[in-house]
């Protein structure tokens, strides 16, 4: 048991001979939040990223999962930065692995802008 209160409740249930499971299941849940893309050009959403921390990467994956038909592309300030000091994965590698077209801010493809 992780908490003293949990131990107390378990003791009570045990003393009453109530069958139970302690943390026996994992339940999923969704927190409804809004995502505001940086730019929309036609039907394409452009998200700009300088520093790209784990919570932002999780958010982008969640946005893509919730909106699989949207065309979301990422413009990186430094696409070859590693996602963390110990990783070999760069921002651009992460984008490719997760199905996001990407480019560097200084090399935005012209066809993205039409």
Where are these regions (language model features)?
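Nucleic-acid endo/exonuclease domains
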Residues: 1-114
């Amino acid at each position: 048991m992780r908490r003293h209160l949990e131990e107390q409740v378990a003791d009570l249930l045990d003393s009453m001979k109530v069958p139970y499971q302690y943390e026996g299941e994992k339940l999923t849940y969704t927190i409804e939040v809004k995502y505001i893309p940086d730019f929309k050009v036609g039907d394409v959403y452009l998200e700009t990223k300088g520093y790209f921390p784990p919570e932002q990467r999780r958010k982008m994956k969640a946005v893509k999962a919730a909106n699989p038909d949207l065309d979301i592309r990422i413009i990186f300030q430094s696409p070859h930065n590693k996602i963390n000091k110990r990783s070999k994965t760069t921002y651009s590698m992460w984008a490719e692995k997760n199905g996001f077209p990407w480019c560097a801010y200084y090399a935005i493809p012209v066809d993205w802008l039409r």
